[in-house]
């Protein structure tokens, strides 16, 4: 009786193994596509699994595109070129206009003695005006993305401060972005609408530029004080904050001097009053350029790149990159 039961069990087991082997051969041969694919012979389960995995990988391959970097530029070098371009152009316009067009750039409505032409004068004559406008066009292009880079950089620093300070600090970051964008737009306006073409509009745009520039400097210094309070800063960060404060002080003092001598020239026509006005105007312009030049200490080793790839792959790629501190 026991032998009969054992034989039956063995027969059932053999039958089950045979059925499993048959199904495996059918799957491995593509569901019975060949003449003997399901009728005898042996099939290797490892080979079957390898074949199925290979087919699945082939099906996924078109969807899993790799992230490709098409352009990679040093953010440091980009900022250096952007900041120095108007400074070099301004110097070139000053020298060439002073040497070759002396009478044109020194003419004023008071007809008084003058030795230093204003920025509007040296960039309003031809061909300097075209050179200046071309350089400002190249300068403004990178300024817009740099403004948003600063916004994202400041937002990444919000974790340093207490939660109670975050809402007001976020508003300050947004204010800095708006002031920066208005300053950039005003720079374009005061460049392309010269005082000789439309003096009232040129004057109002210049005032807008001055106000936004000073407010931007002050707000940036205030924000750095909030974000860096109680933090251990690097030498470059300390240098950046130090020069921002110095250049803001120079801008404030120069603005006071500019207003005083503008009034003396406009209402009293004093000799050399316009020259002093122009002198302080140059100081303001140079201080503004150098203030933005401090970005080389804020972003000493970052890069700007153009990347191609699916959004999910790009997000995963960027999530593995080190974040800004």
UniProtKB/Swiss-Prot annotation:
Database matches in Pfam families: Frag1
**Subcellular location, in the record's words?**
Membrane
Principal location:
membrane
Swiss-Prot/TrEMBL keywords: Membrane, Transmembrane, Transmembrane helix
Its GO biological process terms? GPI anchor biosynthetic process
Membrane spanning residue stretches:
80-100, 130-150, 171-191, 205-225, 243-263, 276-296
Indicate whether Transmembrane appears among the record's keywords: yes
Q: Which InterPro entries match?
A: Frag1/DRAM/Sfk1, PGAP2
A Gene Ontology CC term for this entry? Golgi membrane
- Classify the protein's membrane topology as the record does: Multi-pass membrane protein
Protein family according to the UniProt entry: Belongs to the PGAP2 family.
Which PANTHER family does its entry note? Answer: FGF RECEPTOR ACTIVATING PROTEIN 1, POST-GPI ATTACHMENT TO PROTEINS FACTOR 2-LIKE
Name this protein carries in UniProt: Post-GPI attachment to proteins factor 2-like
């Amino acid at each position: 009786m026991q032998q009969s039961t054992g034989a039956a069990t063995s027969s059932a087991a053999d039958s089950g193994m045979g059925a499993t082997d048959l199904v495996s051969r059918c799957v491995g041969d593509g569901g019975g596509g060949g003449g003997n694919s399901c009728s005898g012979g042996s099939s290797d389960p490892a080979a079957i699994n390898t074949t199925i995995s290979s087919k699945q990988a082939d099906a996924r391959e078109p969807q899993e595109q790799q992230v490709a970097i098409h352009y990679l530029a040093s953010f440091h070098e980009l900022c250096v070129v952007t900041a120095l371009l108007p400074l070099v152009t301004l110097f070139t316009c000053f020298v060439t206009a002073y040497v070759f067009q002396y009478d044109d750039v020194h003419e004023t409505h008071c007809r008084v003695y003058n030795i230093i032409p204003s920025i509007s004068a040296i960039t309003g004559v031809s061909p300097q005006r075209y050179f200046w406008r071309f350089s400002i066009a190249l300068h403004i292009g990178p300024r817009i993305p740099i403004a948003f880079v600063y916004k994202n950089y400041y937002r990444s620093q919000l974790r340093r401060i207490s939660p109670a300070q975050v809402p007001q600090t976020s508003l300050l970051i947004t204010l800095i972005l708006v002031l920066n964008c208005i300053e950039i737009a005003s720079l374009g306006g005061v460049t392309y609408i010269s005082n000789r073409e439309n003096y009232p509009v040129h004057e109002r745009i210049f005032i807008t530029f001055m106000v936004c520039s000073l407010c931007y400097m002050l707000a940036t210094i205030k924000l750095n004080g909030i974000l860096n309070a109680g933090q251990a800063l690097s030498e470059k960060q300390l240098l950046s904050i130090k020069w921002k404060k110095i250049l803001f002080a120079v801008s404030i003092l120069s603005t006071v001097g500019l207003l005083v001598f503008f009034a003396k020239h406009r209402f009293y026509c004093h000799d050399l009053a316009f020259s002093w006005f122009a002198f302080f105007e140059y100081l303001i312009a140079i201080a503004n350029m150098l203030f933005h030049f401090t970005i080389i200490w804020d972003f000493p080793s970052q890069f700007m790149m153009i990347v191609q790839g699916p959004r999910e792959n790009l997000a995963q790629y960027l999530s593995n990159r080190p974040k800004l501190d």
